[in-house]
Amino acid sequence: MPKTITYCSLLLSLVVATANASPGDFIGASSQIDAIIRLDLRKHNLQPNQPVSDIQFIRRVYLDVIGRIPTDKELESFFADSREDRRSKLIDQLLKSPGHESHMFNWLGDMLRVKDDYYRIGKTWTFHTWLKTQLNENRPWDELVQDMLIAEGRLGENGATAYLLRDASMPLDSLSNTLTTFLGANVACAQCHDHPFAEWTQRDFYEMASFFGSTAFERVDTRKPAITLRDERFSKANLVTLLQPNMQRVVYEEGRATDYPDDYAYDDAQPGERVVPKFITWSGSRPANVTTNNPRHLRKLFAYWMTAHENPRFAEAIANRIWKKFFGVAVKEPVTDLDVLEDATNPELLKFLGQLMRDVDFDIREFQRVILNTNTYQQQVSVTPPEGEDFRFPGPLLRRMTAEQAWDSMVLLQRGAEIDRLKTNNAPMMERLVFPFEFSHDTKRIVHDREKIFDFARTLLPDGQFPNGEGGRGLFLGASQRRVKLRGEDSWLRASELPQPMPPTHFLRIAGQSSREVADDGSTEGGITESLMMMNGEFTKSVMNTSLIIKAAQRKSTQVEQIALLYRTCLTRLPRQQDMRQCIAALEQGLDLSDIAWALLNSREFIFVQ
């Protein structure tokens, strides 16, 4: 008989955990990773790459950990440190820096499809702030994911609800995305039929979907209730703005459940039959029945099951993703399909990484620290794996910067290291609009709450008066418009602080930033359009002509010093003798420092992570 899991027993099993490990307890794991890879390389008659120089290491680790190149001062600080473990010290410093939060937000933004707007439901700034807070506090990955899956309430007061509201109109797609993103479970086919290649069946899929059956995802186009409420005192635009953070919510709905579809074609269930929730397993045993006296707990049961230490897929999925982040290719590709672990390039390595993730209690920083301290990470890059062969990690794979790394590095050249501390936070503008009272979420019945809503709105306006007409100041005081139409220095912020995503014509999108319509959609392929933008774009011209590095170079007294500074800041190295001769000759022929900066920014050495 299938095993029965109760709500209380599952909770009890999940709270039994070991004490948090202190930094350094898992550093021996770095050597174990190296040993696993060396053994695999020998098995395939391959050799590890040579160690990287300090210059190569510092540029690589800055890009991989905080998403930008190092400044000249940061270079000086590193080389002034005479300690033997200065690389490890730098890794620790970067993992705890504000830049790491910014870089990880970009990485998760692509994975979680983070957008400013979810199809007319309004801004999702509370989600941005919530996610950045989790990263800043180094919230364990399992707890972060749990919070997104069990979140309830209004978007304006609980930013974590935005994850489920993202696909509110497509609950089955939402489950598919969740299982694919967090478990590497390729279940898309199973929505309509048994998977032709994996062990997933359509019944399995619906049994998992039923954990969300009692949850209502209310994603309302607030233009309709705004029309219902509108009168001469308040413009439609202001009403839409006011209602958006209040009418988007995740709630339990009594009596709601999941049924098999009317066209269900298999013999193991009947069309229209009520689905009994069951957990899928990967141990060869049958799915486990779930019993609970309160259907409201089903979503929590699912979240705790999915993120449990005993579920190897959850740990392996995020470990595989982080490995790809640092090495350019995952142990098991694609990262969205771990259904056949034996197909991984190195199954033993993937299992070890999954166990390591559990051992560090899903501490993402600590896991990254272990990877970054491996000899494997600190070896020279391979340009490309042999054609038709698996990449076996003699070192990282040579790869282009992501769009966000390129943008943030150029913004650094423009403004300096202060960019790591420049933050935008528009969540308070949403939070102040949350109604402090219950109201009808029914578009037709909301008219009964008109006076309560208007009385509350009056308290938000500085002069106590309602703005008249569509041109009124509005409750956001134009903040949403200002954020999209950034100009001059206000636009030179890190990618994490700009609208998510940027418009298609912006540097970031042309360079490969994800549209955030599907997960993991960012591109590092490059192309003619990106090359033309780097050569002729307005932002490149700004860096060439008005940036801090150009001004700093101009203050140097000799051409040699000027050229050396440009090389250190753009390429993280000193110019070679031939480089110096060519640059001096160019200056003597009438070119200036901005031309040298242009050449460096358009070099392969700048755009590739070596």
Residue ranges and their predicted role:
Residues 22-240, 244-247, 314-354, 364, ...:
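Short, structured secondary-structure elements
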Residues 1-5:
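Positively charged n-region of N-terminal signal peptides that target proteins for export
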Residues 459, 474-477:
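Charge-rich, low-complexity intrinsically disordered and helical linker regions
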Residues 252-320, 324-336:
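Active-site-adjacent "gating/activation" loops or surface patches in catalytic cores
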Residues 572:
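Conserved micro-motifs of the catalytic ATP-binding
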Residues 6-17:
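Bacterial N-terminal signal peptides
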Residues 309, 353-357:
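Alpha-helical support elements that line or immediately flank enzyme active sites
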